[in-house]
From Swiss-Prot:
The lineage of its organism: Eukaryota, Fungi, Fungi incertae sedis, Blastocladiomycota, Blastocladiomycetes. Belongs to the complex I subunit 4L family. InterPro entries: NADH_UbQ_OxRdtase_chain4L/K, NUOK/Mnh_C1-like. This is NADH-ubiquinone oxidoreductase chain 4L. The chain crosses the membrane at residues 5-25, 30-50, 65-85. It comes from Allomyces macrogynus. Its EC number is 7.1.1.2. The gene is ND4L. Core subunit of the mitochondrial membrane respiratory chain NADH dehydrogenase (Complex I) that is believed to belong to the minimal assembly required for catalysis. Complex I functions in the transfer of electrons from NADH to the respiratory chain. The immediate electron acceptor for the enzyme is believed to be ubiquinone. One of its GO terms (biological process) is ATP synthesis coupled electron transport. Signal peptide: none annotated. GO terms for cellular component: mitochondrial membrane; NADH dehydrogenase complex. Pfam families: Oxidored_q2.
Amino acid sequence: MLLEIITAYKIGTILFLIGILGFIINRQNILLLIISIEMTLLAISFIIICSALFLDDSAAACFSLYILALAGSEAAIGLSLLVLFHRFRGSVLISASRQ
């Protein structure tokens, strides 16, 4: 059981680092920034769920669902703003906002 939780933590950490790295590398494309933020939130939620299963804690699992609900609403608002930005500027690049 301990080996499985360590493997799950490693997977969650790798996903988190991929999300942070994507956020650092893709600073020009707004859509890729939103995807990177979502990946980091999903990685954090994955780690919390694995901890909740290991510790048999239902409150942590509920907290993880709360994080996922907030991430979904954040993505919906971000994508709607991205659609408006694309309509007005014709591009989803951050450099287009400086015109």
